[in-house]
């Protein structure tokens, strides 16, 4: 271990450096023998101001042994092979200049130590390899310091007494080139590491202590410079470099005889502008770190204003906040100019403006200069973009049509206004000018549309009527991918016909159930789907039967049944023949393109005539097979089950000829047969799968509704996990009640189903508005009534508000169509709410606010809701038969009309003579018909003209006052304000009657002859 001992100022006063460990040195006491330098010290001599290097002890070292010269204090080089007095003089440390100092190595240039004393204490020697490697690194640092001091002395640099940090040697430099030439260990350099690891006793060396005590500096010591040998030495600073492995130093010749060999010529670095502040190792690292944290970021003022990194992020990275409570947001004081600015600066604003221009151009479909991706000059201003948007809006404005197609149902006001390129206000203003006061959304009938379009010079043509048969077009469900995977499926059979012809009774016999007995009024008011096992050809095959209602109000239900069916069974009563709904059912089946099988029912009743029924069917194009046609007709008795098996066999034969197939391995597609709202299960619907398989957990979209399969139920109410083709199932868990007749299909994800449902729901907005029965429809008849309302008494327009609650979605459609048939010239119907489910308190509140009545069709009312309605004085009427509902609505509409007063003629009399009395002239009359009553009104006619209208003041018979005189009797009567009687005048007595106003405006009205 090397120990450097300096002066009291802590600096080395001699230009020397310790030699490499193991350098040979001649000792006079031993003649020409050589010993290795084991310890070198730099001690203070007796003379003041003199410092020397001394070789304290010598021993032979097997590591990097070489011959090194000593350099005297005055610069004289003395070889180690000199006499012993040289050695002794070096030890004595006198002022005679005979002391020896070690020659510096050539490369590293380090600062001289401070004038203060640097004490390096000895360290304990250890035997492990890591400790020795650290010793070598410490020795290398010390040797580099000494080498720099020697180099600065030779080059004449000035020294200010400061000590620099050790400089790391080049890691790529080869240690062989710098190894001493005469080293005794050069022959064993390859095995040097292994020799060192073996722990040779000679290799025990003292370790240099790296931690140097922190000296205290003052300003005078920093600025103080010292001279040695007539030359001023100035300290030089270099950037700190990472430490490198120690390398052996190359021997150097004495300076005087061979000055070029002392060290390699070095170029002094340029002087540093700022004064060097000396700190210890720890202080230097702290200074560097703090400088890096607080160093400013240099930005070119001509560069982009947008920072590469967000200033807030950069500030957080450069100066992370201390742990603790963070400042509350919004308390930073920003410059008032920057408050409204964006975080990204001006360029960010320009980019956003460009995006706005591009977006405007894409939305408005106009060409805006500068809206391209590349910036080319100044963009459009805000005013220019606004002008472009206005121009695009004008271009997209509706254009008045020249020819308008109108159906029988009329048009909405907003739809008509769009077609005429005008506003709804102008249309409504025209209606106001004609005496109509529209309330809310109005539907204008076809005649009124023609009148309005005539004002705008628009031609109106009649559109083709949309028939219910259009709903029964059979949908093609199969795809091209299914053709190779088709399998047989059960047939779907729909039972259709007129009401009370025995459709449900036939199905009850087939299902062995009693459905007809449980139906209200004995009529079907909804579609029932059932799966039945039918024996055929020695085996049992599944069939699906659909029971449709036969009432005229349920035509759409029959159409839906025909659209999904494979075979239509038309039931005709043998004692009743073909009726209106029979013809409609046949038309639906023909429109759907399905085969028809006729079941002539009730052949066991008296008066049954199957031959007459077959004759009637042949007259409408259905020729029986027995008569050479192609329509199977089977006489049956559904009540007793006669010939029902023959009917089923005929149906299965027809189904076999059709070769009904489907692909059960794909996702399901089908049709909604019926839908409703259950108070315990929520929205529910009956699906019939037409292709694929519907499984529990599938995601289904059905027009404006979607469903993630929670549960599937068969026709018996049992849970099932899968529904194969042609199988009807009931599903629960829908987001809302779907529309009966819609097509459903399975989609991949719930998000896709929700998106499609919302899009389709928006497209049905107008249909939902126009679905209200009698939603203020304006017709020419109502217009005429409104115009004449000021002249004719007894007529006025009223409105009946109804809240309808039903059990099934299809029932809403049926009830609405049935009520639309009622005349609405004087009283209009307005359905405020049409929904499925039971009556609730919300319905009662709506009825209170709108003065409406609540009608339930196959719906129930909880007891609490009924009590709540009674307290609110709201009437709730529940029905199970549609006939009763229609009759009550008619009576309610008539009750809104004002009673009409009419004059009814009750008799006739002829004036036979005229008498004078004290009260005036009195007419003697003969009652020819009817009777004459006292205080009744009369009309006096003379030669066919009415000359007076008044009231009988007095009535006498043979001088007795009476109240009435019957026909064939004579009487005398007098009037209070009339006495100009003549013989032959005809008197017509009449009485005033009050009756309920008619729903339909009468063709004529009687003029009131008198008023009380």
From Swiss-Prot:
Localization recorded for this chain is: Plastid, Chloroplast
Where is the sequence biased in composition, kind Pro residues? 240-257
Report the superkingdom from the record.
Answer: Eukaryota
**UniProt-listed InterPro entries:** EF-G-like_DII, IF2_II, IF2_N, P-loop_NTPase, Small_GTP-bd, T_Tr_GTP-bd_dom, TF_IF2_bacterial-like, TIF_IF2
**GO molecular function, a single term:** GTPase activity
NCBIfam families listed in its UniProt record = IF-2, small_GTP
**Which family is it part of?**
Belongs to the TRAFAC class translation factor GTPase superfamily. Classic translation factor GTPase family. IF-2 subfamily.
Q: Does the keyword Plastid apply?
A: yes
Organism, scientific name: Phaseolus vulgaris
What ranges does the record list as Low complexity composition bias?
75-102, 183-194
Alphabetically sorted, this entry's keywords are: Chloroplast, GTP-binding, Initiation factor, Nucleotide-binding, Plastid, Protein biosynthesis, Transit peptide
Q: What does this protein do?
A: One of the essential components for the initiation of protein synthesis. Protects formylmethionyl-tRNA from spontaneous hydrolysis and promotes its binding to the 30S ribosomal subunits. Also involved in the hydrolysis of GTP during the formation of the 70S ribosomal complex.
Give me the ranges of the annotated region G2: 522-526
HAMAP family per the record? IF_2_B
Q: What is this protein called?
A: Translation initiation factor IF-2, chloroplastic
Got any disulfides in this one, which pairs?
none
Region annotated G3 sits at 547-550
**Positions bound to GTP:** 497-504, 547-551, 601-604
GO terms for CC?
chloroplast
């Amino acid at each position: 271990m090397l120990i450097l001992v300096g002066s009291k100022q802590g600096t080395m006063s001699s230009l020397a450096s310790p030699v490499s460990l193991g350098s040979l040195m001649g000792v006079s006491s031993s003649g020409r023998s050589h010993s290795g330098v084991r310890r070198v010290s730099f001690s203070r001599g007796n003379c003041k101001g003199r410092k020397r290097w001394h070789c304290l002890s010598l021993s032979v070292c097997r590591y990097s042994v070489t011959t090194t010269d000593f350099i005297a204090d005055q610069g004289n080089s003395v070889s180690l092979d000199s006499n012993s007095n040289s050695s002794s003089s070096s030890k004595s440390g006198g002022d005679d200049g005979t002391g020896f100092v070690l020659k510096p190595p050539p490369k590293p240039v380090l600062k001289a130590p401070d004038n203060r004393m640097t004490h390096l204490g000895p360290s304990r020697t250890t035997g492990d390899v890591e400790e020795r490697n650290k010793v070598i690194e410490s020795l290398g640092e010390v040797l580099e310091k000494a080498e720099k001091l020697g180099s600065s002395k030779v080059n004449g640099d000035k020294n200010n007494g400061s000590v620099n940090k050790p400089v790391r040697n080049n890691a790529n430099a080869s240690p062989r080139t710098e190894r001493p030439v005469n080293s005794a260990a050069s022959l064993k350099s390859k095995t040097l590491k292994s020799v060192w690891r073996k722990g040779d006793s000679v290799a025990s060396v003292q370790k240099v202590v790296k931690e140097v005590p922190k000296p205290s500096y003052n300003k005078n010591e920093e600025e103080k410079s010292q001279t040695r040998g007539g030359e001023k030495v100035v300290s030089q600073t270099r950037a700190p470099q990472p430490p490198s492995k120690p390398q052996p130093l190359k021997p150097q010749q004495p300076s005087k005889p061979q000055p070029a060999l002392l060290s390699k010529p070095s170029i002094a670095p340029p002087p540093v502008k700022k004064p060097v502040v000396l700190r210890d190792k720890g202080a230097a690292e702290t200074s560097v770190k703090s400088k890096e944290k607080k160093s400013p970021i240099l930005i070119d003022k001509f560069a982009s204003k947008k920072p590469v990194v967000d200033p807030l992020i950069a500030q957080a990275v450069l100066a992370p906040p201390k742990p603790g409570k963070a400042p509350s947001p919004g308390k930073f004081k920003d410059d008032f100019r920057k408050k409204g600015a964006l975080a990204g600066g001006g360029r960010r604003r320009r980019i956003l403006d460009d995006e706005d221009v591009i977006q405007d151009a894409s939305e408005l479909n106009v060409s805006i200069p500068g809206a391209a991706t590349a910036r080319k000059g100044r963009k459009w201003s805000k005013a220019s973009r606004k002008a472009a948007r206005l121009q695009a809006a004008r271009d997209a404005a509706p254009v008045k049509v020249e020819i308008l197609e109108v159906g029988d149902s009329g048009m909405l006001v907003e739809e008509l206004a769009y077609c005429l390129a005008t506003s709804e206000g102008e249309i409504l203003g025209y209606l106001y000018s004609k005496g109509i006061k529209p309330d809310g959304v109005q539907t204008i009938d076809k005649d009124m549309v023609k009148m309005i379009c005539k004002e705008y010079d628009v031609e109106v043509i009649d559109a083709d009527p949309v028939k219910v048969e259009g709903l029964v077009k059979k949908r093609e469900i199969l795809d091209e991918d299914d053709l190779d995977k088709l399998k047989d499926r059960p047939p779907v059979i729909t039972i259709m016909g007129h009401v009370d012809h025995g459709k449900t009774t036939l199905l009850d016999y087939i299902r062995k159930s009693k459905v007809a007995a449980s139906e209200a009024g004995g009529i079907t008011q909804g579609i029932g789907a059932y799966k039945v096992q039918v024996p055929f050809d020695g085996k049992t095959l599944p069939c699906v039967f659909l029971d449709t209602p036969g009432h005229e109000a349920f035509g759409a239900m029959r159409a839906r049944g025909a659209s999904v069916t494979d075979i239509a069974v038309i039931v005709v009563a043998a004692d009743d023949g073909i009726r209106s709904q029979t013809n409609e059912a046949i038309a639906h089946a023909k429109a759907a393109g399905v085969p028809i099988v006729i079941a002539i029912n009730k052949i066991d009743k008296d008066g049954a005539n199957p031959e007459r029924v077959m004759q009637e069917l042949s007259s409408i194009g259905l020729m029986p097979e027995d008569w050479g046609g192609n329509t199977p007709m089977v006489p049956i008795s559904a009540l007793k089950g006669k010939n029902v098996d023959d009917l089923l066999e005929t149906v299965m034969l027809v189904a076999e000829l059709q070769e009904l197939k489907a692909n059960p391995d794909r996702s399901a597609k089908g049709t909604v047969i019926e839908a409703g709202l259950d108070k315990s299960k929520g929205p529910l619907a009956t699906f019939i799968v037409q292709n694929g398989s519907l499984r529990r957990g599938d995601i289904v979209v059905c027009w404006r509704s979607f469903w993630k399969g929670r549960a599937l139920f068969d026709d018996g109410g049992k849970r099932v996990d899968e529904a194969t083709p042609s199988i009807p199932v009931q599903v629960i868990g829908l987001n809302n009640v779907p529309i009966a007749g819609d097509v459903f299909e399975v989609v991949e994800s719930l998000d896709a189903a929700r998106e499609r449902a919302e899009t389709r729901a928006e497209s049905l907005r107008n249909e939902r508005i126009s679905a209200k029965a009698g939603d203020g429809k304006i017709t020419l008849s109502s217009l005429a009534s409104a115009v004449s309302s000021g002249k004719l008494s007894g007529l006025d327009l009223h409105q009946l508000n109804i809240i309808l609650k039903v059990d099934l979605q299809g029932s809403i459609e049926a009830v609405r169509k049935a009520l639309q048939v009622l005349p609405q010239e004087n009283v209009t119907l307005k359905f405020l709410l049409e929904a499925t489910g039971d009556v609730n308190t919300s319905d009662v509140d709506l009825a209170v606010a709108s003065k409406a009545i609540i009608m339930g069709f196959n719906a129930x009312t909880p007891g609490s809701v009924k009590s709540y309605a009674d307290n609110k004085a709201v009437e709730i009427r529940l029905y199970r038969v549609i006939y009763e509902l229609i009759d009550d609505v008619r009576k309610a509409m008539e009750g809104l009309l004002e009673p009409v007063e009419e004059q009814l003629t009750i008799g006739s009399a002829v004036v036979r003579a005229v008498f004078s009395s004290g009260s005036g002239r009195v007419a003697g009359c003969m009652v020819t018909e009817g009777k004459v009553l006292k205080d009744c009104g009369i009309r006096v006619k003379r030669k066919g003209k009415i000359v007076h209208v008044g009231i009988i003041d007095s009535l006498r018979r043979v001088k007795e006052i009476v109240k009435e005189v019957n026909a064939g009797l004579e009487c005398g009567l007098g009037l209070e304000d009339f006495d100009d009687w003549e013989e032959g005048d005809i008197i017509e007595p009449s009485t005033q009657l009050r009756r309920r106003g008619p729903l339909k405006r009468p063709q004529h009205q009687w003029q009131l002859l008198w008023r009380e």
